């Protein structure tokens, strides 16, 4: 489904076109709270003490140094990096601060770092625009836009109904995502040893 199809569907369903604000609010809701595989993207960055993240970065899924033997980096806090900061070496950990990934120790070289991350869903403006969530889970946008529309026109009864449907659509997307990620197989624990 694209933005034009979504608008046409809602116009047919309720007999009026919701404000563009409704669609912007749904996209903001999705970016604030939803994290599913359809929202994931990959980027290859060059390591440095501070690496600028993609502009659509929401949250990290995984990160590794792309060397002969892939070396995963562990997440930590900026405070923890400051406490054990080293000015040179092979990075083993990272922290996210103000749109950048800080590496510790600071790298000696310039290896590639591959990140898998949750990407922001773009705002919809042209009729041909779509997002991964709109394509795979259109009910989230349908019910979210209807809930925001009902709130804007102060129809709280309808808003409660549409909000309930929106919550169900989000739960359905998360359940579907879980099945897709693990192919229906049970998850197996991975034992790690503390350094």
Task: Describe the residue ranges of each PLM region.
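Glycine-enriched, solvent-exposed interface loops adjoining structured elements
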Residues: 1-195
């Amino acid at each position: 489904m694209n933005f034009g199809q979504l608008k046409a569907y809602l116009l047919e369903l309720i007999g009026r076109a919701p404000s563009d604000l409704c669609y912007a609010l749904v996209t903001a809701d999705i970016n604030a709270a939803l994290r599913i595989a359809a929202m994931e993207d990959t980027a290859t960055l060059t390591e440095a003490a501070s690496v600028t993240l993609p502009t659509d970065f929401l949250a990290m899924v995984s990160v590794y140094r792309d060397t002969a033997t892939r070396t995963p980096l562990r997440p930590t806090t900026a405070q923890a990096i400051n406490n054990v900061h080293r000015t040179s070496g092979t990075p083993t950990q990272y922290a996210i601060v103000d749109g950048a990934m800080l590496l510790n120790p600071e790298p000696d070289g310039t290896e590639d770092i591959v990140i898998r991350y949750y990407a922001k869903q773009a705002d919809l403006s042209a009729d041909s625009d779509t997002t991964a969530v709109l394509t795979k889970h259109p009910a989230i946008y349908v019910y979210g836009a209807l809930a925001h529309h009902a709130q804007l026109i102060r129809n709280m009864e309808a808003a409660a109904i549409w909000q309930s449907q929106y919550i169900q659509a989000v739960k359905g997307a998360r359940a579907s995502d879980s099945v897709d990620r693990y192919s229906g197989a049970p998850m197996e624990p991975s034992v790690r040893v503390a350094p």
